[in-house]
Amino acid sequence: MMNRSAEVQRDTLETRVKVRLDLDGTGESRIRIGVPFMEHMLDQVARHGLIDLDIEADGDTHIDDHHTVEDVGITLGQALAQALGDKKGIRRYGHAYVPLDEALSRVVVDFSGRPGLQFHVDFVRARIGQFDVDLFQEFFQGLVNHAALTLHVDNLRGINAHHQAETVFKALGRALRMAAEADPRQADRIPSTKGAL
C-alpha cells in the first residue's frame, strides 16, 4: 500500500490551518489550535486511531472558537481524503463503542465518497469549561464534507459532558483506524461494486 500521509494548509480571512497526518503512524500528536478542549479531543483521535497528527491553527478566537473549530474539521477532512487516495485495499467501514465511566458512545464510519452526518449527542450541559458544545457538530460537518465520508455519531448514555465528548472522539479514532486499515484480501481493489468511492 502506498504512503498514506498528507499535508494540507487552508488559509482564509478568519483562520490559517495546517494539518499533517500519517494514517499508518503510532498515535503521536502535536495539536496547537488555541482551543484547549478541542486540542484534548483531537489528541484522543490521534492516540486511539494510531494516526500521527500535527495540527496548527491561528484563528479569530478573540471573537469565538467557531471558525477555528470548523476550519480544523474542514482541513482534517481534506488531509484524510488526500492520504486515502483512491481507497484501494482499505476496509472502508469502521465502528467503535467506547465507554468512560458512566458514558458510552458509538461511532460508525464509511469512506463512501458521499458526505453524510448523523450526529446524536444530547450534551448534559452547554459548555465544557469555556468550550461551547455546539461547535462539535460544526467540526464533524466540516470533517464529513471534506473527507467525503458517512459518519454516524451516537452518545448512548452519559451524565458528564466531558465524558460524553471524550467517548465520542476516542470512538472516532478507533472507527477511522478500522475503516482505513489495509485489507490484504482486497489488496488493490476498491471496496465497492461500483469500482469507485
From Swiss-Prot:
Transport listed as a keyword: no
Compartments, record wording: Cytoplasm
Pathway: Amino-acid biosynthesis; L-histidine biosynthesis; L-histidine from 5-phospho-alpha-D-ribose 1-diphosphate: step 6/9
Key words of the record: Amino-acid biosynthesis, Cytoplasm, Histidine biosynthesis, Lyase
Alphabetical list of InterPro entries matching this protein: IGPD_sf, ImidazoleglycerolP_deHydtase, ImidazoleglycerP_deHydtase_CS, Ribosomal_Su5_D2-typ_SF
Annotated EC: 4.2.1.19
Main EC class the enzyme belongs to: lyase
Positions of disulphide bridges: none
Superkingdom field: Bacteria
GO MF annotation terms: imidazoleglycerol-phosphate dehydratase activity
Gene Ontology biological process terms, A to Z: L-histidine biosynthetic process
PANTHER family xrefs: IMIDAZOLEGLYCEROL-PHOSPHATE DEHYDRATASE, IMIDAZOLEGLYCEROL-PHOSPHATE DEHYDRATASE HIS7
Assigned protein family: Belongs to the imidazoleglycerol-phosphate dehydratase family.
Protein name per its UniProtKB record: Imidazoleglycerol-phosphate dehydratase
Native species: Alkalilimnicola ehrlichii (strain ATCC BAA-1101 / DSM 17681 / MLHE-1)
Lineage of source species: Bacteria, Pseudomonadati, Pseudomonadota, Gammaproteobacteria, Chromatiales
Gene name of the encoded protein: hisB
